[in-house]
Amino acid sequence: MGSGARFPSGTLRVRWLLLLGLVGPVLGAARPGFQQTSHLSSYEIITPWRLTRERREAPRPYSKQVSYVIQAEGKEHIIHLERNKDLLPEDFVVYTYNKEGTLITDHPNIQNHCHYRGYVEGVHNSSIALSDCFGLRGLLHLENASYGIEPLQNSSHFEHIIYRMDDVYKEPLKCGVSNKDIEKETAKDEEEEPPSMTQLLRRRRAVLPQTRYVELFIVVDKERYDMMGRNQTAVREEMILLANYLDSMYIMLNIRIVLVGLEIWTNGNLINIVGGAGDVLGNFVQWREKFLITRRRHDSAQLVLKKGFGGTAGMAFVGTVCSRSHAGGINVFGQITVETFASIVAHELGHNLGMNHDDGRDCSCGAKSCIMNSGASGSRNFSSCSAEDFEKLTLNKGGNCLLNIPKPDEAYSAPSCGNKLVDAGEECDCGTPKECELDPCCEGSTCKLKSFAECAYGDCCKDCRFLPGGTLCRGKTSECDVPEYCNGSSQFCQPDVFIQNGYPCQNNKAYCYNGMCQYYDAQCQVIFGSKAKAAPKDCFIEVNSKGDRFGNCGFSGNEYKKCATGNALCGKLQCENVQEIPVFGIVPAIIQTPSRGTKCWGVDFQLGSDVPDPGMVNEGTKCGAGKICRNFQCVDASVLNYDCDVQKKCHGHGVCNSNKNCHCENGWAPPNCETKGYGGSVDSGPTYNEMNTALRDGLLVFFFLIVPLIVCAIFIFIKRDQLWRSYFRKKRSQTYESDGKNQANPSRQPGSVPRHVSPVTPPREVPIYANRFAVPTYAAKQPQQFPSRPPPPQPKVSSQGNLIPARPAPAPPLYSSLT
């Protein structure tokens, strides 16, 4: 789009004529309203044409796909658009209030909405976010420039104005970063040539290969509703358009924005918006936690206000996108276009996603400024630093909720296989045909599971199969958290729960608060290293009573607020025993304050006026007996509404979780921890793995029964010969003994056998043992008697065979007892 290009007929170039007051005679009947162009330094008037097979025809909205020819800076471009099916879920909900303050719930039929995304033909890495509800309105991002387009007011010929986003006047916005840092960054940008958008996109895709999904909820305050003429439909369409713009920006980081709900405060604001931005942000996230999150599940909520805060465009918590208590931000939507406002919301939502300001860092985005620049310059590009910050969030498990692909009942109802969202009627969606080549579970052409697959995605899906029940899918992160397990029949992990707020932790020195045990020492160690600890109370009182950037209890309007003595422990964190200087990727300001023999260490991160200071004492920290810090005040811990009697409700074998259900210790079964079991709760999923239990039992049987039997069999086989010989030796020995007993028992011998064995030649069948003779049996056992003289010598026996006596042997002599 060179400046020397010739303008075609029908396209009027208007540059700087507004400043000279000459625009009236030039534009004639086509003159736009002054209010429509008062914020522009330059613009063109064009007439887009819709393309069909016949090349051109009159505009006809609400098509699924459409192409237009537009002209900008003398050059004709063809843009191709496709309805953004991922933008709105089937159960998109709008909350409003009647005059009595009663909540009204509406599910508008918006399946055939008119919000599109697309690209410019022939322009690499271009992107478009447009609506054609009442003409073309939206953003076009080309290689090196971004353009806005909107219908020309009161035109009957489909005329539009198109302008560079750099030509939009912007109100200077206050930021906490000093001008010196901004000038230093500007000088650095001028010296170094930034990389091309192609290089940046390639780098980001390498860093963020997995698509994340932010389920966004938007709340519009009463003043902004009044500003829109109290037209609920107009507010709704404007916020849907805003979400479409956000989606076109975040898609560069492989992040998709899904608008899941909208609430319009039609009958009055439901929070106090008096005070500074920090006060309003605190009020909003408290209202969100108490009322909104119970009505509609979402990852982040953004409040849209008409009221300004002295030049501060918005404010949000950093890295809290999945938090129940802090995943929110506030955004000022005053006299600016929705295109410009989109960059503000993208900036504040970026803080929720863990992104810090780019100021003072070596960041590039292919443009003069980036979305996360503290000046809220209206940029459409995220920087390399933002991609790195978001990567850190995901690596630290801070964005687990973003991995939840919208379920079929939460996806846009019009089926569109290939958009990587599981729409109604689909079982999976692997994306483009090329992407589906790498998916082993999903049929890309039908978005159905393959015949052997049970699932295709989710924390509890592996190798196209459900992980067995009891498989850990979300681990315990602190002593105030509880783990979650797969249930064996779903690819999704159980919803994240934690121990109920107010439960004692750290040996009763602190309370659980939103899944973390909040106490001073732990916060000091996070900032100043493992040796640091909380400073004495006198440090808190002395420093926080000053009411400056290093010691305060928040803001009162645009000024720091001094801490009352009773609230000093809930202001700026004060530590001692500091031996390490923190390294955060940014340069914080550290201050030492001597106090009664010690040094009080405090820190100011200088993140800007739109970011809460992480150097303040964490909410939920115990500041006294039965008290906690809340909104920079030391209040009674009863505000946590802890009502769990673990002895009665959980029978002393568990704790209550954030859903007020018992989470049982190992060995006890939910729901009341009264009977034996495997622990867990009705919310956590089964804590034991049935397959693992069967495997365990099988291993026990194998090692304690089968293995010993096998060892015995091997031993017997090896020693078989020795055992066999031992067996027969014992058998033979038993036989000999039996025979000897039979010979000694006359009642069992035949009559031909003599009753006394001759000492000269014993029978052959009777074994001869050395120095042993057969002892005759008598009717009554007598003590052994010995003769008074030795027996006669035995005669020698010749070797002439066995001798047979001529007459029977004489009967044995009878001996009387020895006297």
Swiss-Prot record:
Tissue: Widely expressed. Expressed in chondrocytes. Isoform 2 is highly expressed in liver and heart.
GO-annotated biological processes: amyloid precursor protein catabolic process; cell adhesion; cell adhesion mediated by integrin; cell migration; cell-cell adhesion mediated by integrin; cell-matrix adhesion; cellular response to lipopolysaccharide; integrin-mediated signaling pathway
Active site: E348
Posttranslational mods: Proteolytically cleaved in the trans-Golgi network before it reaches the plasma membrane to generate a mature protein. The removal of the pro-domain occurs via cleavage at two different sites. Processed most likely by a pro-protein convertase such as furin, at the boundary between the pro-domain and the catalytic domain. An additional upstream cleavage pro-protein convertase site (Arg-56/Glu-57) has an important role in the activation of ADAM9. Phosphorylation is induced in vitro by phorbol-12-myristate-13-acetate (PMA).
Binding site for Zn(2+): H347, H351, H357
Record comment: activity regulation: Synthesized as an inactive form which is proteolytically cleaved to generate an active enzyme. Processing at the upstream site is particularly important for activation of the proenzyme, whereas processing at the boundary between the pro-domain and the catalytic domain does not appear to be essential. Inhibited by hydroxamic acid-based inhibitors.
Region spans: Disordered: 734-763, 780-819
Phosphoserine modification, residue list: S758
Reported cofactor(s): Zn(2+)
Ranges of biased composition (kind: Polar residues): 735-750
Residues in the Extracellular compartment per record: 29-697
EC numbers for this chain: 3.4.24.-
Record site: Cleavage: R56, E57, R205, A206
Cytoplasmic-facing ranges: 719-819
Disulphides: C322-C401, C363-C385, C365-C370, C473-C493, C644-C656, C650-C662, C664-C673
Domain Peptidase M12B, first and last residues per copy: 212-406
Domain Disintegrin: 414-501
GO molecular function: collagen binding; integrin binding; laminin binding; metal ion binding; metalloendopeptidase activity; metalloendopeptidase activity involved in amyloid precursor protein catabolic process; metallopeptidase activity; protein kinase C binding
Ranges of residues in domain EGF-like: 644-698
Pfam families attached to this UniProt entry: ADAM_CR, Disintegrin, Pep_M12B_propep, Reprolysin
GO CC, any one term: external side of plasma membrane
Function: Metalloprotease that cleaves and releases a number of molecules with important roles in tumorigenesis and angiogenesis, such as TEK, KDR, EPHB4, CD40, VCAM1 and CDH5. May mediate cell-cell, cell-matrix interactions and regulate the motility of cells via interactions with integrins.
Disease: Cone-rod dystrophy 9: An inherited retinal dystrophy characterized by retinal pigment deposits visible on fundus examination, predominantly in the macular region, and initial loss of cone photoreceptors followed by rod degeneration. This leads to decreased visual acuity and sensitivity in the central visual field, followed by loss of peripheral vision. Severe loss of vision occurs earlier than in retinitis pigmentosa, due to cone photoreceptors degenerating at a higher rate than rod photoreceptors.
Protein name as catalogued: Disintegrin and metalloproteinase domain-containing protein 9
The organism's taxonomic lineage, starting at the top: Eukaryota, Metazoa, Chordata, Craniata, Vertebrata
Gene this chain is encoded by: ADAM9
